[in-house]
Amino acid sequence: MKATIQRVTSVFGVPRASVFVPRISTPFILHNYISNGRMDLFSKEFHNGRVSKSDLWSSNKEEELLVSQRKKRPISPHLTVYEPEMSWYLSSLHRISGVLLALGFYAFTITLGVTTIMGMDTTFQDLNKWYHEKMPKWSQWVAKGSAAYLFAFHFGNGIRHLIWDMGYELTNRGVIKTGSIVLAGTLVLGTYLLAQ
């Protein structure tokens, strides 16, 4: 049985530290020879002098080179290596719109529930009256516009996801096309809801 040292390189051609690789055939023997990428110091061949200590690990220079190269590499996956795409923004906006719509829904229903439990008997008509009489006009437009456009976008992008689930428009061109349709539909439906 002959032990050899092989230079292992990464996919990108960056040299790695030399690693002890014995030429053996069974996994059991392999376990006796390798421990964490190094020669097992307790193996019989090591103590019988068949493998020299220099075969265990290469010089410290290679290890230092490896450490310095790793420090310079970006953490993977790193956003700076990718070009921004429409799908990123629409995916993020879909999640954000869902969270904001849910928060508005929960605030509304919790308000109705808590006031009913406290004996105030608040109804939808009471909240609607408060909205129109107590809230400033600009605040009404902001609330209604936010709800209208967020709902329109979330609704349209949900349909887009259903189309993808059926296996359609999964190419880059299809993703951009459906994203553009969703944005145009958001403008139309959101403006319609805001005008109501």
From Swiss-Prot:
Transit peptide feature, positions: 1-53
Annotated Pfam families: Sdh_cyt
Topology Mitochondrial intermembrane: residue spans: 119-137, 196
Sequence positions that bind heme: H154
Keywords: Heme, Iron, Membrane, Metal-binding, Mitochondrion, Mitochondrion inner membrane, Quinone, Transit peptide, Transmembrane, Transmembrane helix
GO cellular component: a single term: mitochondrial inner membrane
Molecular-function annotations in GO: electron transfer activity; metal ion binding; quinone binding
Membrane topology: Multi-pass membrane protein
Main localization, broad class: mitochondrion
Topological region Mitochondrial matrix: 54-97, 161-174
Binding site for a ubiquinone: S91, R95
Protein localization: Mitochondrion inner membrane
Gene Ontology annotations of biological process type: mitochondrial electron transport, succinate to ubiquinone; tricarboxylic acid cycle
Phenotype of the disrupted gene, per the record: Does not affect SDH or TIM22 complex formation.
Regions that span the bilayer: 98-118, 138-160, 175-195
Task of the protein: Homolog of SDH3, but seems not to be a stoichiometric subunit of either the succinate dehydrogenase (SDH) complex or the mitochondrial inner membrane translocase TIM22 complex.
UniProt family annotation: Belongs to the cytochrome b560 family.
Name listed for the protein in its UniProt record: Mitochondrial inner membrane protein SHH3
Record lineage: Eukaryota, Fungi, Dikarya, Ascomycota, Saccharomycotina
Gene symbol of the encoding locus: SHH3
